[in-house]
Amino acid sequence: MAHDQLYRYLFENYAVRGELVTVNETYQRILTNHDYPSAVQTLLGEMLVATSLLTATLKFSGDITVQLQGDGPLKLAVINGNHQQQMRGVARLQGDIAPGSSLKEMVGNGYLVITITPTEGERYQGVVGLEGETVAECLESYFQQSEQLPTRLFIRTGQHEGKQAAAGMLLQVLPAQDADRDDFDHLAQLTTTVKGEELFSLPATEVLYRLYHQEEVTVYEPQDVEFRCHCSRDRCADALMTLSDQEVNEMIEQDGEIDMHCDYCGTHYLFNSLDIRAIRHDSSGNLLH
């Protein structure tokens, strides 16, 4: 794939659907401006792939946030994606994390939170204990508990052409369909054989042919995946206006300006005393652009 894309596909003879995604560029963008330990980089790649695959299961406009938190040296890791496959993510650390650290070693006593937020309607949140060895295993447990749909995730991270790479696949029994468990296990066994380098470098149709050449598979038009941060100067201004005038003035007096930094994309938004005065006198925010 020339750039990050997600493919949906359907097995003609089984009540099972699949997804295949490559997120190399998006993954590299999330890691830019962050000096994460290698184990955290790998974990964020796994979470990014998983979030993209989960977001593609949405039947409505909205977004999904996959978040890990606990009492270990990795305090927080979060990936957010929407139905347009616009992704962003960040991690927060407190302590050293050795190369090759396991999920449990990084997060400690913690949990995985999946938050689904429709554009219209009520937000849903599911919490899963870190029973599995990997993010994929934890999410498979989530699907089993909440959706009762047999689901498998196959996530690969590594390097391709000297850069970080991440990709993966999802298999899921179709809702309201009576899929034979043996059929699902058969397809899962085939999918398990996929190699990271195949996903990182080969066209999706070739990967699917290699895996399922004896099956009838319908592949749908791909959807682009990209890094997209939703921060803006206006949002930062709104946040500043939640503070008291005294707090804002003290920050200006101390440093001469207020520097608001976005953890997701690394953008800095600077506000001086003139900016603050303009914000206070223009509730519409027109002077901020």
UniProtKB/Swiss-Prot annotation:
A Pfam family for this UniProt protein? HSP33
**Keywords recorded for this protein, A-Z:** Chaperone, Cytoplasm, Disulfide bond, Redox-active center, Zinc
Post-translational note: Under oxidizing conditions two disulfide bonds are formed involving the reactive cysteines. Under reducing conditions zinc is bound to the reactive cysteines and the protein is inactive.
From what superkingdom does this record's organism come?
Answer: Bacteria
InterPro entries cross-referenced by the UniProt entry: Heat_shock_Hsp33, Heat_shock_Hsp33_C, Heat_shock_Hsp33_N, Hsp33_helix_hairpin_bin_dom_sf
Question: Main localization of the protein?
Answer: cytoplasm
Where it sits in the cell: the answer is: Cytoplasm
GO CC annotations?
A: cytoplasm
Q: List the disulfide bonds.
A: 229-231, 262-265
Q: Does the keyword DNA-binding apply?
A: no
Molecular function terms in GO for this entry?
protein folding chaperone; unfolded protein binding
Q: Which Gene Ontology BP annotations are present? A: protein refolding
Please state which protein family the record places this protein in: Belongs to the HSP33 family.
Biological role: Redox regulated molecular chaperone. Protects both thermally unfolding and oxidatively damaged proteins from irreversible aggregation. Plays an important role in the bacterial defense system toward oxidative stress.
Write down the PANTHER family for this protein, in alphabetical order.
33 KDA CHAPERONIN (PTHR30111:SF1)
Its name, as the record gives it, is 33 kDa chaperonin
Native source organism of the sequence: Pectobacterium carotovorum subsp. carotovorum (strain PC1)
